[in-house]
């Protein structure tokens, strides 16, 4: 990681679907009051598939590294590190492609980048000050995913189970779990692990203090 005096602090938070990434990220956010904060979702950077027929777009494997426009994500993170405003893409899940609209995002002191594959790409990892892997038992993750997809996304139980078996589980073991070796901190039990969250917040505050000198 290069020396980045007076630059934003970038925290990468990853783990499998339903691991508690968002809970951990929000817990860090809540404890870092007094600093400007930004949460970026890797999901916003799914590829633009507008040139593909809809029948092909619906077959997208969203758990594969090739589903993401990592080059754009790296570029926009570098812009944020230079205190530049970015135009973050917005993904349209109903159309399975990027929306024509964008969201203007201002740089902040602390940037949390959350997603299933944020530790997969070396160029992305190199921009991070702290890399976190949220490690949660497979059974707990699938239960959480079923609850979320049925309650929040209107999915059927069978469709969630089929997707889990065909893509989510194999992609986790092939691409996501191996990135654990790049993590500075592995957080078991997700957002329930208050000790790990307290340690993370202390470390972030320490980095911020050093950059303010």
From Swiss-Prot:
For the keyword Magnesium, the answer is no
**Pathway entry:** Pyrimidine metabolism; CTP biosynthesis via salvage pathway; CTP from cytidine: step 1/3; Pyrimidine metabolism; UMP biosynthesis via salvage pathway; UMP from uridine: step 1/1
- Statement: the UniProt record of this protein carries the keyword Heme: no
Broadest EC class assigned to this enzyme: transferase
Where is it chiefly localized? cytoplasm
Query: What keywords tag this UniProt record?
Result: ATP-binding, Cytoplasm, Kinase, Nucleotide-binding, Transferase
EC code(s) of this entry:
2.7.1.48
Gene Ontology terms, cellular component aspect? cytoplasm
The record's section on Gene3D superfamilies has: P-loop containing nucleotide triphosphate hydrolases
SUPFAM superfamilies given in the database record: P-loop containing nucleoside triphosphate hydrolases
Compartment(s) of residence: Cytoplasm
Q: Which residues cross the membrane?
A: none
Q: Which PANTHER family match?
A: URIDINE KINASE (PTHR10285)
Q: What name does UniProt use for this protein?
A: Uridine kinase
Q: Which organism is it from?
A: Ligilactobacillus salivarius (strain UCC118) (Lactobacillus salivarius)
For this protein's source organism, the top of the classification is: Bacteria, Bacillati, Bacillota, Bacilli, Lactobacillales
